Each structure stands twice: as C-alpha cells, then as structure tokens.
From Swiss-Prot:
<keyword id="KW-0808">Transferase</keyword>
<protein>
    <recommendedName>
        <fullName>Dephospho-CoA kinase</fullName>
        <ecNumber>2.7.1.24</ecNumber>
    </recommendedName>
</protein>
<keyword id="KW-0067">ATP-binding</keyword>
<dbReference type="GO" id="GO:0015937">
    <property type="term" value="P:coenzyme A biosynthetic process"/>
</dbReference>
<dbReference type="GO" id="GO:0005737">
    <property type="term" value="C:cytoplasm"/>
</dbReference>
<comment type="function">
    <text>Catalyzes the phosphorylation of the 3'-hydroxyl group of dephosphocoenzyme A to form coenzyme A.</text>
</comment>
<comment type="similarity">
    <text>Belongs to the CoaE family.</text>
</comment>
<dbReference type="InterPro" id="IPR027417">
    <property type="entry name" value="P-loop_NTPase"/>
</dbReference>
<dbReference type="Pfam" id="PF01121">
    <property type="entry name" value="CoaE"/>
</dbReference>
<keyword id="KW-0173">Coenzyme A biosynthesis</keyword>
<keyword id="KW-0547">Nucleotide-binding</keyword>
<feature type="binding site">
    <location>
        <begin position="23"/>
        <end position="28"/>
    </location>
    <ligand>
        <name>ATP</name>
    </ligand>
</feature>
<dbReference type="GO" id="GO:0004140">
    <property type="term" value="F:dephospho-CoA kinase activity"/>
</dbReference>
<feature type="domain" description="DPCK">
    <location>
        <begin position="15"/>
        <end position="210"/>
    </location>
</feature>
<keyword id="KW-0963">Cytoplasm</keyword>
<keyword id="KW-0418">Kinase</keyword>
<dbReference type="InterPro" id="IPR001977">
    <property type="entry name" value="Depp_CoAkinase"/>
</dbReference>
Length: 210
C-alpha cells in the first residue's frame, strides 16, 4: 500500500486556521506569516492539486462527466465544470463527495509535514467545511462587505452580481466573527496590519511551544 493510500487522521503540529471571505486579503496575510518562517497549507491550492492531470480525482471527474470536461492540454476545464455544478445540486453533491475527502486527506498530510513552530491552514470555507476541527486556534481576516466587493470586482474582473452570489454562498461576516478566536482588521494601512499580525504571531509561537 502506498503512503498516500494510508489514511492519516492525527495532526502532530499546532495549527492556526486562517479564514475570511473573498477579497478579505487572506493570501496577503498568509504571505506575511510565510515571510516570518511559518509553513502555510492552502486548501485552495490543494483543491487544484487533487484534480491535476493523472490524479485519481480528475480520472473520476472524466468518467462521470465525459472527456468534454477537459481542455485540449488535458487539464480540467474549470469554467465548464463550474457551469455544470452551479445549477445542478446532484452534480454538485457528487463532486463534493468525491473531492472533499481527497482534499482533507492531503491537508492533514501537509499539516503533519510542516517543520515550523506552528503551521497555518488557509481556507476560505474553514468553518463551513468543518476544517476548524483540525485547528488549535482560528484567525479571521476581516473587512467590511463594501470593501470586499470593491476589491474582488477589481481583482477578478467579475460582475457585482457574481461577487454577491459568492458572498451569499459563504457564512456571513457576523457568524465568522462569532466563531473565530481572533480577528484581524485588514481594512487599514499595511503597516498597521503587519504590526497587529506580528503581535498575534508572537502569541501563537508561545501557545505552540508550550
């Protein structure tokens, strides 16, 4: 049996769950922590890796939806898949049932492979998908909704309607604020955000090294 086939359930490292809605600046904050020497595991990156050419995930998707779901270079046609599952709950449920266990298993493996004093798990749907159960503490990157919308429209070049539908599909800002252990306001100057993040980082180091 290959190492990948063995199901790993225990996490040996101290884990900080980092989350926030679309356009809140999760990547910028995780990059700052990475610059401080902290290993980062990104759920979105893993979600792409489990459907790379040659992966079991992509093979299953092609078997289910047909070869038309592939681009000419053999990669997954993400926009075509998004259209298929967006308005069809049966397709959406099938896809989630396939991918969620693959993503979770790789997340656990990557968290255990981290060698820094603590490890960050970045996940936009940390609470929604129950990934917070793998975390010792959680940090919400928070901005007002109008800032979220403005940043996302500008960054992703998508319509206001699309942004609002993405936000509506996520847990509300208020719910996330209630669930998170710590909140970092990212609607300020980079200097202030860095200052507060370093203070949080020092606290996490103390907790992790206890």
């Amino acid at each position: 049996m290959s190492e990948q086939a063995v199901k790993v359930t225990n996490i040996n490292n101290w884990v900080l769950g980092l989350t926030g809605g679309i356009g809140c600046g999760k990547t910028a904050v995780s990059n700052m922590l990475e610059a401080l020497g902290i290993c980062v595991v990104d759920a979105d990156i893993i979600a792409r890796q489990v459907v790379e050419p040659g992966s079991e995930g992509l093979k299953a998707i092609v078997t289910h939806f047909g070869a038309d779901i592939l681009l000419a270079d053999g990669n997954l046609n993400r926009s075509a898949l998004r259209e298929l599952v967006f308005s069809n709950n049966e397709h959406k449920n099938w896809l989630n049932t396939l991918l969620h266990p693959l993503i979770r298993q790789q997340i656990i493996i990557d968290l255990n492979n981290a060698t820094s004093p603590y490890v960050v798990l970045v996940a936009p749907l940390l609470f929604e998908n129950g990934l917070d159960k793998y975390c010792n503490r959680t940090l919400l990157i928070d901005v007002p909704k109008n800032v979220q919308i403005e940043r996302t429209v500008k960054r992703d070049n998508i319509s206001l309607e699309q942004v609002n539908s993405i936000i509506a599909a996520q847990m509300s800002r208020e719910q996330k604020q209630q669930q998170a252990d710590d909140i970092l306001n990212n609607d300020r100057s980079l200097t202030l955000v860095k200052h507060d993040l370093i203070a949080l980082h020092k606290g996490y180091l103390k907790l992790a090294l206890k």
